[in-house]
Curated annotation (Swiss-Prot):
This is Gamma-glutamyl phosphate reductase. GO terms for biological process: L-proline biosynthetic process. It comes from Synechococcus sp. (strain WH7803). Catalyzes the NADPH-dependent reduction of L-glutamate 5-phosphate into L-glutamate 5-semialdehyde and phosphate. The product spontaneously undergoes cyclization to form 1-pyrroline-5-carboxylate. GO terms for cellular component: cytoplasm. Its main location: cytoplasm.
Amino acid sequence: MNEVPEPSPELLQRAGAVRRAAVDLGMADDGQRMQALQAMADALAERSDALVAANREDLDRSASEGLAPALLARLKLDAAKLEGAIDGVRKVASLKDPLGRRDLHRELDQGLTLERVTVPLGVLGVIFEARPDAVIQIASLAIRSGNGALLKGGSEARCTNEAVMEALKAGLASSAVSPDALALLTTRQESLALLKLDGLVDLIIPRGSNELVRFIQDNTRIPVLGHADGICHLYVDAAADLDKAVRVALDSKTQYPAACNAIETLLVHRSVAASFLSAAIPAFRDAGVVLRGDAASVALGVPESATEADWRTEYLDLTLAVKVVDDLAAAADHIRRFGSRHTECIVTEDAAAADRFLSSIDSAGVYHNCSTRFADGFRYGFGAEVGISTQTLPPRGPVGLEGLVTYRYRLRGDGHVAADYASGASRFTHNDLSL
């Protein structure tokens, strides 16, 4: 990747405008922010034909340039997908206000009261893949949580992104929220210079390749939220219901293989490997999945041999690595060695084994008897997500509204001074009050 350039005067001016708008947005009340989102949704709906046409232009150009089928699938924004995205904006508008929530209320002394309340982060800098519905998701979450946003999408989606941003700003213009709260970056140089906007941007959220995320983490002083890989695993335990295991594994891989929560490695307990693979191999073959396995799984019918590189690969396509393991402990060891702490699943009817798996695997999501494709902010009831974080510190997993706020301590007194408590003239009471 290129070296990070200094921000241009024009970028500094635009970022400053977003910052100023974000201050006002953070003080907007719940109703004003809800109304702003409804106006954004209305503007998108009114311009739906133009948005789909802009996306078709991006699709045609990208197909002629040889963009991979998996990336073309992400790039596509047809009428149905757009309708779903618009519905998502309205759902975010209806979510409970994340701001002004008090989770601590304490009397430190008579007339000296402390509270901790949620407030916006400020300005988000979001760099995302060629997926134009991401612009809609991120913008809606930013406005609902009181944050401004600088957004940079993949160049493959430039026509769609520009048309979507124009619609979103038109919606905001008819609301109490300034259109300046959102800005679209359009060049590679701007996305690189974004990394030097500390003081104007409070959090960077990268969504894209491992290389992109690593580069951003290594080249900015701004906090970064995101994940570098989505190497997800499904483990078929000795006590698995094999029909259930085939169904869950198939969905986890094929429901949307380009997603970061699709499985890339299938681990199978040795005692059920023959019976499970005899059913799973034809099912995956019929779904167009290429299987690559270790020696034990190849001996049981997996058609291609895997190398160690396969255990580290996020295919984002219809390819799946398969490995036979001796037991749950061996499966857990493999996941710890090669996983990215995104999402893992165990299929078993043994409750104790499930509990061991759920408590021993340090991933953002650990599942029992269900598809890894549920690792999604919308499916969790968050309305939408800005991304998935695999970091240990919060927010972790799918990041929705709750992950886009911080908190502020407010202390109200009446001439209280610390010297009185240091001398013993006054004493703290530290009485918790009702929230």
